[in-house]
Amino acid sequence: MKNLSVIIQARMGSHRLPGKILKKIANNSLLDWVIKRVKKSKKIKKIILATTKNEKDDILQEIASRNKIFFFRGQNQDVLGRFYKAAKTHGAEVVVRVCADNPFIDRKLIDLLIEKFKSKKYDYICNHQNRLNSKYADGFGAEIFSLELLQKLFNNAKKKAQREHVTQYVWDNKKKFRILALQAPKSLAYPSLKFDINTLKDLNYIKKFVRANKISLLSTASDIVKYKLKENKPKEVKL
């Protein structure tokens, strides 16, 4: 697949936990966890960190440089516009979108999205746990689509929510697009589990969880779910 890129969406100005992407989890910042785990994908050649022009985000350019990935800065509020221009500027024809608050993003799940997209049967594919009952635990999510689709969103999305959330227009107009939500395998079908970081409570929990289970950049999504199940036994979803 030509000109395939991952775009990681990141900024310092989180409302609930400002600066969370630089918070340390073991020996890496949250953002470093995301970047380094994405880099383990066997199918990704280019990674782009997309952030804002706010001076608070200057440090993210340094992080991108240190990790030897590409960088783009755009408008703060128009996240869709920033995302589209990042893809356009760096010549991406197919984009995998990853959020910077998911430290356990799994390269195997990213590679699976890419393989499914190669069929050209779908405009948009995701593994979000809250989308079309895909049943994935929360925190492994990513989505894939073409630059052509992204341009349609950029040109047609008018509502505030559609500019703030990159693919909201797709979900508001589901009948216009060929959508696939990948179904979780049995080992990951625990939608009640949560691994993303939005609050200080989330961060403190993940720090303890990583330390207690010696989780590393090589730990898989299946490993992480197994460790979590040792703590508590959530109801498994029947497939």
Question: Where are these predicted regions, by residue range?
Answer:
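N-terminal nucleotide-binding beta1-loop-alpha1 segment
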Residues: 1-17
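Hydrophobic targeting segments
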Residues: 3-8, 31, 46-49
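A short, N-terminal amphipathic alpha-helix
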Residues: 30-47, 60, 66-67
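Conserved beta-strand segments of alpha/beta enzyme cores
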Residues: 46, 70, 178-180
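Short phosphate-binding loop-to-helix
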Residues: 53-120
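Conserved core of the sugar-phosphate nucleotidyltransferase
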Residues: 105-193, 204, 208, 223-239
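Short, conserved phosphate/pyrophosphate- and ester-handling motifs at nucleotide-, phospho-/glycolipid
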Residues: 199
